[in-house]
C-alpha cells in the first residue's frame, strides 16, 4: 500500500448558529464522516446537528508538478437532528442517507429533502420509551430496509417501509458501536467487550472481553472483526480513590476476531495507540489503523511485518477562528475508506476534513469513490427568455434560434458510411470468403460451383421479407410448456385453428433434412441448437419436441462445458462391445480418496473418464427419450491434466473456432478418449480387452539403398485409431487410369474432375495403411550420397475401427465431388506372412479369409458459414441402430434416410470421425442393468452403501448424525428412501439485458452437489434414521455457498480446513447409483431439481415427490416444504439454515400424510384447504 498522499483539505463546517446559550459560540467540530456507496459524495456531520455533502470538482496541479490536488464543491447542507444535538453517525442507503443523533434518526434523500424523521414520539409501540440515548445504527444482516439501533438501554429494530413499529431485541443495551456480518450483529459494548448477537434467534452467541476500559472503534470485513479501545490505567495508590473516576490509556493493540472459529486471532501491535481502524474494502487482509496524533499504518493481518507508515499533517493551513484552539494539540478523528478503496478521509480538531488517495505513478487522479457511480442530480437550469425580437425573413439564418440542451447525437449527425434502408430491409449477403481467397490468384473467371450455390440463372418465386421473417420466427424454438398449456385452455376459432396448423407445419421445418436446390440454405435439422429458459427454468423447455424416436433414444444437452464431445459419445454409445465394456466396469469399485488424488493430481471428484463414461451410458439407457446432461463427465474431463495439455478444453461453445480448428478438436478428443479408457481399464481392473477391441497393429521397416549401407531396422507397434490420409494427385491419377482405361493420357490431363466417379473410402484406406517414403541417410552421407527407404504397413485391423478424417478444406472439396465416397461396408482380406491388407467393396468366391466391416456411424462437421468464420460450426453424428439411421444433433434426435447419410456432395458437410465395426460384433446384445437382477450380478461390489469412505484424513471431532446400514437392512426393490440434496453455486448465471430492462436467461447458474442425506423410510423402529449424510469435497472456487438455502458455510467443503468428514463426488454418486439400480423408491421434495443437479436419471415409478403430490394445477404454484410442514404437520422447519436431514425427514412425513389422506378419501379437500390457507398467508409461514 505504498504511494498514498494527501490531495485535499476541506473546511467542512460553517459558523455556528446564533443562540442564547453561551457555549453556542464555540466552533463546530466534525463528528461523523461517510463515503457514499451510490454517488460521488462525502457526507459530513457536525456538532450542531447539520449534515453536509461534498462532490469532487476539477483537478489542479500544485507547486510540485508531480503532486496533484482535487478540489471539492459543496452539494447539500441540511439540519438532521433535534435541538442542535451532534450527528453521531451516518448510514448510506440506496434511497438516501440516514443521520443519527442521541434522540432521533433522520432519513433524507441525497438532495437533502426529508423522507423520514423518527423520535420516541414516532412509534406506537410500548418500546418507544427505549428510543433515547442512541449511540449507533446499522442495517440488519443481508437486508437494506431493516435498521438496527444500539443505545444505552436496549437493542432496537425498525423497518424503513413501516417506521411506526419499533421492535426490541432481548438485550440489556450498554452499546457503543453496532455493525453486522452476514449472519450476526457485532455489538461493541461500553465496557470494551465485543458481543456477537443473532437477530434470528434473538440471543447472544458469543462475547469477547477485548478491552478493559472503553471501545473506540469497530469494523467488520467478511468473517473478520477489528476493534480498538482503551484500558483502565492501573494506580499505585488507590486507597483514597474509590469514588474517583478511572483513568484510561489507549491500547497499543488492535484486536482481530474470526467469527468462523469464534475466537480471537493474533492482534496487531500499534505502539502509537489505536483510535480508529478500518478494513480495506477490496483487500480484506489489509487494515488501516490511525492514532489521535495522526499516525497512519497499513498492516497485513496475515503478515504483520508488512507495514506502510504515514504521518498526517494536522496543523491548520490558516489561522483558527477561535484563539482557544491554538492552545490545544491537534488530534485526528473519524477515519473512513471509500467503497472502491481508492480514497480515505479523516477529520481533525480544527474541523477540517483531509482526503488521501493512492497515486504512486503520477497519473491523473480519479474522481470516483465507487466503481460505477450514479450521476448526481443537478438543479434545473432556467434559460431566461429572449428580449430581442427575431424576425423571420430571407436575411435571418435559421441557426439564430438556438437548439435545446441535449445529450445524445442528433439524427443529422450520422456517419457518412451509414446507409438507411426501408423497414424490413437487410444488408446484402457477404461475399463468400473462399472466393475472396481465390481472387488473390489473379484469375479472371472462376468455375461456378453448382453443388455449393445451387443452379444458376433460375427464377425464384417472389416472397416478401415479412413472410420470410414470419417463417423463420416459427422455425427457431417451440413454445414453452407453460405457454403451450395456456394456449390449449383457450377456445380457438376456425381462423385460429388454421393458423395453428400453419404454425405446426412451419415448426416441422426444424426436422427438414433436405431443402430444394433453389434455396442455398443448410437444412434446419443441422442448425446449432440453444436451450431457452423461461421464468420456470429449464424444466419449462420442451425437449420432447426435438426427439422423434418414439421413446427409444435420448439426446444430450449442450449447455455444459465441452459439449462439443456430444456427437462422439452418442456414436460410441451404440457400439455394443464398447458400450458393454464401459458399463460392466461399473460393477467394480474404484473410489480413490487420498490427498494425492484430490489435491496433487487435481481430481477432487475422485473419478475417471472410464467411470464417468460408464455412468453416462447407463443414464442414457435409463432416460429412454428424455434429455441427459453430461456435466459430471465434463467436470472430470476438464480437470484431466492430459486434456489440459492437449488443449482439448473448450468453455465457450466453440465461439473462437473455425472449421479446421473444430475438426482438430474433436479428433484430438477421440484419441484422448480411447487412450484414457485404455489407461483407466489397466489401472482400475487390469483389463486389456479394449486393446483387442480397438488396437491397430503396424510394422515399420527402414532399409538402406546403398550397396554397402548396413542400416536395416524393423519395428512393430500399435495404435488405437487410424488417421486417414489423402492420396497425392499422382496416385489418384494412376488409379483413375487403371479403373478407367478409356482415358487417353496423351490427349487429356487427368484431373480431379476425371476421377470423381472412380474413388471412394477404400482408395484412401489402401493408401493410408501402406506408406512408403525415402529420406537421406545421415549416417553414411559423408561416404557417398544415398537414401533410406521407410515403409510402414498396417498388419492387423481391430474389430472396432475408428478412422480420423483429418483433412484440409481443399481435400474435403475433392471428397464432395466423389459421388459414393463413403461406403456402407467393405471387406478386409486377412494377410499372411506380413503381407499388406487388401480391401474390396464386395466379396468374390476366391476371397474366403476376410472380415466384413459395416459402418456404425460417423461424426460430421456442419459449416453454417465460411470455413474461416469463427463460432459458426457445429458437430452432429449419424448412427445406425437396428437397421435404421438416426441423426443426433445434441438433443435433437430423428430418423433420417440412408441416402442422405451417404450424400457428401454438400460443401457444408464434412465427415470427421468414421467408425466401422466387424459384422461379428455388431449384433452383440447390449448389457442393460435390470433392477430385478441387479443385486445378483456377478462381481458386483456394493460395499460403499454399508461403510464410510472419507476423503483424506478423518475428523474424529465431527459428530455423526447418521447410522450406517447393515447387511440385514440391505435395500431391495420398493424400499423407501427419503433423500435431500444441497448444492453450491460454482458459476453465476448469464443474463442478456435488453434496452427496455427486460432480462433473458442465457445460461443458468451451475450448481454442484455439496451435501446429500438419505434416511430410512420404511415403517419400523429406525424409520427416519439417516444412513447417509455426506459432505462433498470441493477444491475449486465456489461462487456462492447459498448458505441460507444449503446450510453450507465457507470452509465446510475445503479438504484441508473443514471440520467435517468429506467424501468425493463419485462416492456419493455411486451410493445413489447403487440404490437406484437396486430398485429403491426415493421420497423427497422437489426431486426433479435434485436429480438434475446430481445427473441421475430415475424412472418415474421410483420417485415419490411431495412437491407434485401437493400441487394444484389451477393455481400454477408449487408449495414449499416449509409451508406444507406448517399447514399439514403443524411444525416449523427451516427456521435457520437448511438441514438436509431435517428436510428429508419432513418430506417423508408429508408422504406418509399423503398416503393417509388418500386412503381416507380426503385428498381433494385437504389440497383445497392447503391452498386456501396459502392465499390467506400469502404462502408464507408467519414468524
Swiss-Prot record:
Gene3D superfamilies, per the entry: Cysteine proteinases, Ribonuclease H-like superfamily/Ribonuclease H, YVTN repeat-like/Quinoprotein amine dehydrogenase
Cofactor annotation comment: Binds 2 metal cations per subunit in the catalytic exonuclease domain.
EC number: 3.1.13.4
One protein family per Pfam: RNase_T
Superkingdom of the source species: Eukaryota
Gene Ontology annotations of biological process type: mRNA processing; nuclear-transcribed mRNA poly(A) tail shortening
GO CC field: P-body; PAN complex
UniProt similarity note: Belongs to the peptidase C19 family. PAN2 subfamily.
Protein's name in the database: PAN2-PAN3 deadenylation complex catalytic subunit PAN2
Amino acid at each position: 500500500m505504498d504511494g498514498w498522499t494527501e490531495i485535499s483539505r476541506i473546511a467542512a463546517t460553517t459558523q455556528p448558529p446564533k443562540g442564547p446559550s453561551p457555549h453556542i459560540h464555540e466552533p463546530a467540530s466534525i463528528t461523523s464522516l461517510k463515503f457514499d456507496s451510490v454517488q460521488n459524495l462525502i457526507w459530513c456531520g457536525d456538532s450542531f446537528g447539520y449534515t453536509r455533502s461534498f462532490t469532487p470538482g476539477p483537478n489542479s496541479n500544485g507547486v510540485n508538478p508531480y503532486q496533484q490536488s482535487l478540489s471539492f464543491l459543496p452539494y447539500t447542507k441540511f439540519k438532521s437532528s433535534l435541538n442542535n444535538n451532534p450527528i453521531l453517525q451516518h448510514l448510506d442507503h440506496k434511497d438516501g442517507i440516514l443521520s443519527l443523533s442521541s434522540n432521533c434518526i433522520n432519513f433524507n434523500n441525497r438532495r437533502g429533502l426529508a423522507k423520514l424523521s423518527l423520535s420516541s414520539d414516532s412509534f406506537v409501540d410500548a418500546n418507544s420509551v427505549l428510543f433515547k440515548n442512541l449511540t449507533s445504527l446499522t442495517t440488519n444482516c443481508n437486508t437494506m430496509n431493516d435498521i438496527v439501533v444500539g443505545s444505552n438501554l436496549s437493542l432496537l429494530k425498525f423497518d424503513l417501509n413501516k417506521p411506526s413499529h419499533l421492535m426490541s431485541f432481548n438485550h440489556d443495551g450498554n452499546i457503543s458501536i453496532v455493525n453486522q456480518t452476514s449472519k450476526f450483529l457485532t455489538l461493541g459494548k461500553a465496557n470494551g467487550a465485543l458481543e456477537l448477537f443473532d437477530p434470528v434467534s434473538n440471543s447472544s452467541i458469543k462475547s469477547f472481553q477485548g478491552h478493559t476500559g472503553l471501545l473506540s472503534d469497530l469494523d467488520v470485513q467478511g468473517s473478520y472483526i477489528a476493534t480498538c479501545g482503551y484500558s483502565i490505567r492501573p494506580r499505585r495508590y488507590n486507597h483514597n480513590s474509590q469514588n474517583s473516576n478511572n483513568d484510561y490509556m489507549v491500547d497499543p493493540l488492535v484486536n482481530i476476531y474470526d467469527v468462523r472459529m469464534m475466537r480471537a486471532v493474533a492482534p496487531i501491535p500499534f505502539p502509537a495507540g489505536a483510535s480508529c481502524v478500518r478494513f480495506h474494502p477490496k483487500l480484506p487482509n489489509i487494515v488501516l489503523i490511525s492514532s489521535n496524533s495522526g499516525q497512519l499504518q497499513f498492516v497485513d493481518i496475515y503478515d504483520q511485518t508488512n507495514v506502510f507508515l504515514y504521518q498526517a499533517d494536522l496543523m491548520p493551513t490558516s489561522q483558527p477562528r477561535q484563539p482557544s484552539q491554538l492552545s490545544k494539540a491537534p488530534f485526528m478523528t473519524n477515519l473512513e475508506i471509500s467503497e472502491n478503496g481508492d480514497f480515505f478521509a479523516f477529520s481533525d480538531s480544527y474541523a477540517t476534513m483531509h482526503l488521501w488517495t493512492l497515486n504512486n505513478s503520477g497519473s491523473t487522479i480519479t474522481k470516483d469513490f465507487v466503481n460505477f457511480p450514479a450521476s448526481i442530480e443537478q438543479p434545473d437550469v432556467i434559460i431566461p427568455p429572449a428580449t430581442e425580437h427575431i424576425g423571420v425573413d430571407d436575411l435571418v439564418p435559421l441557426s439564430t434560434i438556438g437548439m435545446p440542451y441535449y445529450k445524445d447525437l442528433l439524427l443529422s449527425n450520422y456517419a457518412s458510411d451509414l446507409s438507411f434502408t426501408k423497414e424490413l430491409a437487410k444488408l446484402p449477403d457477404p461475399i463468400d470468403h473462399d472466393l475472396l481467397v481465390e481472387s488473390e490468384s489473379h484469375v479472371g473467371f472462376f468455375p461456378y460451383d453448382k453443388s455449393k450455390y445451387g443452379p444458376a440463372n433460375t427464377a425464384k418465386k417472389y416472397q416478401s421479407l415479412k413472410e420470410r421473417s414470419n417463417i423463420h420466427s416459427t422455425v427457431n424454438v417451440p413454445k414453452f410448456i407453460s405457454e403451450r398449456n395456456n394456449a390449449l385452455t383457450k377456445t380457438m376459432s376456425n381462423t385460429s385453428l388454421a393458423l395453428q396448423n400453419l404454425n405446426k407445419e412451419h415448426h416441422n421445418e426444424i426436422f427438414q433434412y433436405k431443402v430444394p436446390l433453389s434455396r442455398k440454405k443448410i437444412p434446419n435439422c443441422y442448425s446449432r441448437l440453444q436451450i431457452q429458459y423461461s421464468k420456470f427454468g429449464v424444466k419449462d423447455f420442451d425437449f420432447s419436441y426435438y426427439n422423434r424416436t418414439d421413446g427409444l433414444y435420448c439426446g444430450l444437452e449442450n449447455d455444459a462445458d465441452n459439449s462439443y464431445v456430444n456427437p462422439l459419445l452418442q456414436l460410441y454409445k451404440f457400439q455394443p462391445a464398447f458400450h458393454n465394456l464401459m458399463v460392466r466396469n461399473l460393477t467394480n469399485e474404484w473410489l480413490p480418496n487420498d490427498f494425492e488424488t484430490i489435491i496433487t493430481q487435481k481430481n477432487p471428484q475422485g473419478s475417471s473418464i472410464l467411470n464417468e463414461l460408464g455412468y453416462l451410458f447407463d443414464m442414457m439407457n435409463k432416460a429412454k427419450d428424455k434429455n441427459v446432461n453430461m456435466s459430471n463427465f465434463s467436470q472430470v474431463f476438464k480437470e484431466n491434466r492430459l486434456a489440459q495439455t492437449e488443449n482439448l478444453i473448450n468453455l465457450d461453445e466453440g465461439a473462437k473456432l473455425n472449421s479446421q480448428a473444430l475438426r482438430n478438436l474433436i479428433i484430438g478428443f477421440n484419441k484422448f478418449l480411447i487412450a484414457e479408457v485404455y489407461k483407466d481399464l489397466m489401472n482400475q481392473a487390469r483389463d486389456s480387452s479394449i486393446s483387442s477391441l480397438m488396437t491397430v497393429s503396424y510394422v515399420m521397416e527402414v532399409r538402406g539403398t546403398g550397396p554397402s549401407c548396413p542400416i536395416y531396422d524393423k519395428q512393430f507397434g500399435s495404435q488405437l485409431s487410424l488417421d486417414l490420409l489423402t492420396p497425392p494427385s499422382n496416385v489418384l491419377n494412376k488409379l483413375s487410369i487403371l479403373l478407367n482405361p478409356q482415358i487417353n493420357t496423351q490427349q487429356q490431363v487427368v484431373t480431379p474432375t476425371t476421377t470423381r466417379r472412380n474413388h471412394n473410402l477404400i482408395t484412401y484406406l489402401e493408401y493410408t495403411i501402406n506408406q512408403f517414403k525415402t529420406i537421406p541417410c545421415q549416417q553414411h552421407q559423408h561416404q557417398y550420397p544415398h537414401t533410406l527407404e521407410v515403409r510402414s504397413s498396417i498388419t492387423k485391423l481391430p474389430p472396432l475401427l475408428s478412422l480420423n478424417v483429418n483433412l484440409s478444406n481443399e481435400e474435403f472439396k475433392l471428397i464432395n465431388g466423389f459421388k459414393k465416397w463413403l461406403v456402407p461396408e467393405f471387406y478386409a482380406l486377412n494377410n499372411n506372412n506380413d503381407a499388406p491388407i487388401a480391401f474390396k467393396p464386395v466379396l468374390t468366391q476366391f476371397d474366403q479369409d476376410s472380415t466384413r466391416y459395416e459402418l456404425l456411424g460417423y461424426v460430421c462437421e456442419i459449416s453454417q458459414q465460411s470455413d474461416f468464420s469463427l463460432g459458426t460450426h457445429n458437430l452432429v453424428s449419424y448412427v445406425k441402430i437396428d437397421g435404421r439411421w438416426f441423426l443426433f444433433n445434441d438433443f435433437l434426435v430423428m430418423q433420417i434416410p440412408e441416402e442422405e447419410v451417404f450424400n457428401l456432395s454438400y460443401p457444408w458437410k464434412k465427415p470427421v470421425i468414421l467408425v466401422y465395426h466387424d459384422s461379428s460384433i455388431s449384433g452383440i446384445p447390449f448389457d442393460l442393468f435390470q433392477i430385478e437382477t441387479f443385486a445378483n450380478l456377478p462381481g458386483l461390489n456394493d460395499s460403499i452403501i454399508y461403510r464410510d469412505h472419507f476423503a483424506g484424513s478423518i475428523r474424529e471431532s465431527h459428530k455423526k448424525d447418521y447410522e450406517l446400514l447393515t447387511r440385514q437392512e440391505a435395500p431391495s426393490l420398493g424400499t423407501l428412501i427419503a433423500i435431500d440434496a444441497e448444492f453450491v453455486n460454482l458459476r453465476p448465471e448469464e443474463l442478456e439485458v435488453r434496452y427496455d430492462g427486460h432480462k433473458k436467461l442465457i445460461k443458468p447458474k451451475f450448481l454442484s452437489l455439496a451435501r446429500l442425506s438419505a434416511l430410512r423410510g420404511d415403517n419400523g423402529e429406525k424409520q427416519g434414521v439417516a444412513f447417509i449424510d455426506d459432505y462433498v469435497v470441493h477444491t475449486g472456487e465456489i461462487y456462492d455457498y447459498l448458505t441460507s438455502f444449503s446450510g453450507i458455510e465457507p470452509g465446510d467443503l475445503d479438504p484441508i480446513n473443514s471440520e467435517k468428514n468429506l467424501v468425493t463426488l463419485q462416492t456419493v454418486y455411486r451410493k445413489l447409483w447403487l440404490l437406484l439400480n437396486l430398485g429403491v423408491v426415493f421420497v423427497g421434495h422437489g426431486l426433479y431439481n435434485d436429480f438434475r443437479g446430481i445427473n441421475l436419471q430415475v424412472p418415474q415409478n421410483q420417485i415419490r415427490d411431495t412437491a407434485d403430490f401437493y400441487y394444484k394445477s389451477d393455481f400454477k404454484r408449487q408449495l414449499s416444504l416449509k409451508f406444507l410442514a406448517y399447514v399439514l404437520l403443524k411444525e416449523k422447519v427451516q427456521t435457520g439454515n437448511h438441514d438436509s436431514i431435517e428436510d428429508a425427514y419432513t418430506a417423508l412425513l408429508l408422504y406418509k400424510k399423503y398416503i393417509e389422506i388418500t386412503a381416507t378419501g380426503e385428498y381433494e379437500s385437504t389440497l383445497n384447504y392447503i391452498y386456501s390457507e396459502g392465499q390467506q398467508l400469502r404462502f408464507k409461514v408467519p414468524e
